[in-house]
Amino acid sequence: MSRVCELTGAKANNGMAVSHSHIRTKKLQQVNLQKRRLWWEEGKKWVNIKISTKALKSVQKVGLDKFAKSNGVDLKKF
């Protein structure tokens, strides 16, 4: 199961963990993904999506259909 947002394509970021003594080690910063069942008004059906919490906040503000179109995602495949 890949940890990629199905609406935005957001995926893990490579970062550094820095200790108190300033020793740096590589760290993988994962996306906060949630499995959500969202109502798609235009298609008149429920859509099951793995979505990041940042994208979920935008969907609640703008709407699922408008947000998906702005990101070039076809909701018919879900």
Curated annotation (Swiss-Prot):
GO terms for biological process: translation. Keywords: Ribonucleoprotein, Ribosomal protein. The keyword Ribosomal protein applies. It comes from the Bacteria. InterPro entries: Ribosomal_bL28, Ribosomal_bL28/bL31-like_sf, Ribosomal_bL28_bact-type, Ribosomal_bL28_sf. Gene3D superfamilies: Ribosomal protein L28/L24. It holds the Pfam family Ribosomal_L28. The keyword Ribosomal protein applies. GO terms for molecular function: structural constituent of ribosome. One of its GO terms (cellular component) is ribosome. Belongs to the bacterial ribosomal protein bL28 family. HAMAP family: Ribosomal_bL28. This is Large ribosomal subunit protein bL28. The gene is rpmB.
